[in-house]
Every structure is written in structure tokens, then in C-alpha cells.
Amino acid sequence: QMCIRDRVTGASYGIGFAIASGMAKAGATIVFNDIKQELVDKGLAAYEEAGIKAHGYVCDVTNEDAVNELVAKIEAEVGVIDILVNNAGIIKRIPMCEMTAAQFRQVIDVDLNAPFIVAKAVIPSMIKKGHGKIINICSMMSELGRETVSAYAAAKGGLKMLTRNICSEYGEYNIQCNGIGPGYIATPQTAPLREIQPDGSRHPFDQFIIAKTPAARWGEAEDLAGPAVFLASDASNFVNGHVLYVDGGILAYIGKQPQ
């Protein structure tokens, strides 16, 4: 059983769009936001093409006042938010010692502070209603380190712990807060890394990912829809404070022995 209103941050395309589309098929009313009007318009057109009615809003989720105003507007125009998916995120691939503190803070602001701000805005109404679902989009980098992504890994590790803490503080109000940790997902942003090279070979990073993934492929955005629907439904009412890794098995796999 799916609740009525589902708000997804950053759901105009990619992973957020796939998750929201899956929830719409399960019966949710979709409310999404993005930082620019052009992205909201693009998202609305994509939902319409898919036969999904969606409500789109412009909002900078790092701005607490703007988020509070938007949540009040959504509650007035659509209704109380039953399900929140915190999907907005950025990454800066810069070696740590070359990254400025301002660049580090920018990643933390979007990937960690924003989920805190948005969750804080919707939880009071969930408490009043007596139930709620919060899904934070974490990452394999909530568990692993990798060169050039120190800010992203720090933020996603923090988001994992924020997920657990929301569970700890608000579980008694029938609010379930869980996370989804995607593996390497085939999106427009990763397309250049998956293109066949002029000599017919695979891109080195593509080879690396396929070798490291027991499923031997990149994930698809649609692979995340089912787990999100589960975590948003009554089927997960006793699941709280967990991160479900949808990674094709990377975190379980040490890799093959060199020949």
C-alpha cells in the first residue's frame, strides 16, 4: 500500500525521476522540486509524457527559509507530505589537498545539510498525522573511500548517520527513515564513461566497474524504483534506520585474484 503524497527532491531526471515514476505507478501523488525553473519544466514534460501527473516547484533545498515556505505551500495546495525522498546531490571530483574549503562546504551543504533541512521541515506534520516515510539517497561512498571524492564521501557517510539518527529520534511517532545506497548507475552523466572507444575497446573506467561488480554491469536508474517503493510502503513499517545498498554486489565483493 502506498501513501498519498510523495515529495522527491531533484526528481526532474535520472535517479530521482525513476524513483518518482515507480512510486507513481504504485499510487503516489508526485511532488518534486529542482533548483531551476527549466529543470522543473523539463521534469513536468517528462512526467506528462510518461502519463504521470506531477506537481513541480522551484526551490534551493540548502535554503532553510525557502524550504519551509515550499513545504507550507505544498501542504496548502496538494496536502501533507507522507513520503519524502531526499535525492538532490552534487559531487566534485578534486583531490583533497587541491580542494578549497568553500568547495568542500558546497558539497556538504547540498548532500548533507539539505536532507537535514528538508526532513526537519516535513517531520512535524508527519508526527501530527501519525506516520511518515523518509528515504535518503546515500551512496556506496557512505561505506567506502575513493580518490578525489573526499567531500562527497564525507557527506554521504554523514547522511547514513543522519538516517539512523532520524530513526532514533522519531521512530516512536511511526516515522520510518531509511536510505538507499546506489552503486554505479547508467545515467546521462556517466554515458561518456560507458561509450565504446574508437578501437572497439571499453573505457578503462567502464572495465573497472564491470570487473568490480558481481552483476557485471552498470545499474539502471529503474533498478532503484523497486527498493524505493518498498521503503515507502506499508511493507517496510518495521524497517527503520537501514541503508539498502542497490549496487550489484560491489560492497560484498573483494574482487578477483590477479592472474
How does the language model describe each region?
Residues 2-4:
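Short, small-residue-biased leader/transition segments that mark boundaries at the very start
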Residues 10-14:
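Conserved glycine-rich cofactor-binding loop
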Residues 85, 171, 176, 239-241:
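Short, small/polar-rich loop/turn modules that mediate ligand/substrate recognition or access, typified
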Residues 95-96, 103-108, 209:
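Substrate-binding pocket helix/loop in short-chain dehydrogenase/reductase
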Residues 119, 155, 163:
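Active-site helix of classical SDR
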Residues 124, 168-172, 237:
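Alpha-helical segment proximal to the catalytic Tyr-Lys
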Residues 139:
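Residue(s) in the substrate-gating loop at a strand-loop-helix junction
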